[in-house]
Design a protein with these regions (language model features):
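Beta-strand scaffold of nucleotide-dependent catalytic cores
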Residues: 30-34
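Short helix-capping/linker segments at secondary-structure and domain boundaries
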Residues: 150-164
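Short connector loops/turns at beta-strand edges and beta->alpha or beta->beta junctions
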Residues: 35-38, 102-103
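A conserved beta-turn-beta hairpin within the catalytic core of GNAT-like acetyltransferases
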Residues: 38-44
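Unchanged
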Residues: 18-19, 50-139, 160-174
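Acidic, metal-coordinating catalytic segment for phosphate/diphosphate chemistry
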Residues: 1-21, 25-26
C-alpha cells in the first residue's frame, strides 16, 4: 500500500488495449456494432482490440484494428486519451487514438470470426454520439470517454496539440 502496510487484493491482470476514434472530414466518427457476450448485448463501439501481439506497439495495434474491424486506414494519428476503465478490479489500460485523413483500406477485407462475424460498421455525427451517451443509449466506456474527449478537443481547437501517436504510455511502456 502507499503507506507501506501490506494488504491482500484480488484483481484481474490485463494485457491492455487500444481504441480508435476515427473522425472524417464531415465530423462523423466511424463505429462498429457487435455482440458482446459478457453483457449479452450488441453494442456500438469504436474499432478496438487487445495488445495481444508480442512486440507490437500500441499505434500498430490501433492501425491493425482499424483495418480489421472497419477496413479503413488513416493518414494522421494522435493520442486522444489514456484510461484505466476498471481501476478497482483490473490493471487494464486503454489508449484511445484519434485517427484522421481516413480512406478505405486496400486489398481484401479481414476474415472475421467469432463475435466479429456480423459486425456492422457505420459513421455517426460526433454530436449524435455525445447526445446518445448522455441519454444513456451508449454503454461502451472507452467510446463514451473518447467521444467526450474529442468533443472537448474540438471545442478548444486543440486537435493539433494532442500528443503524438508514439507518445510515452507509462501504463504500457513499449
Amino acid at each position: 500500500m502507499p503507506d507501506g502496510r501490506a494488504s491482500t487484493r484480488d484483481y484481474m491482470k490485463h494485457t491492455g488495449a487500444v481504441g480508435v476514434l476515427a473522425l472524417d472530414e464531415q465530423g462523423r466518427v466511424l463505429l462498429v456494432r457487435q455482440y458482446r457476450h459478457p453483457v449479452r448485448h450488441r453494442l456500438w463501439e469504436m474499432p478496438a482490440g487487445l495488445l495481444d501481439v508480442p512486440g507490437e506497439n500500441p499505434l500498430h495495434a490501433a492501425q491493425r484494428e482499424l483495418w480489421e474491424e472497419a477496413h479503413h486506414k488513416a493518414g494522421d494519428w494522435r493520442v486522444l486519451i489514456d484510461v484505466y476503465p476498471t481501476s478497482g478490479g483490473s490493471d487494464e489500460a486503454i489508449r484511445v487514438f484519434l485517427a484522421r485523413d481516413l480512406a478505405e483500406a486496400d486489398g481484401e477485407k479481414f476474415a472475421a470470426e467469432g463475435e466479429e462475424l456480423d459486425m456492422e460498421v457505420r459513421r455517426f455525427p460526433l454530436d449524435d454520439v455525445v447526445r446518445a451517451a448522455l441519454a444513456g443509449d451508449l454503454h461502451n466506456g472507452a467510446l463514451v470517454a473518447g467521444a467526450m474527449a474529442l468533443k472537448a478537443a474540438l471545442a478548444d481547437g486543440a486537435l493539433d496539440t494532442l500528443r503524438p501517436a508514439d507518445a510515452p504510455w507509462p501504463a504500457r511502456p513499449f
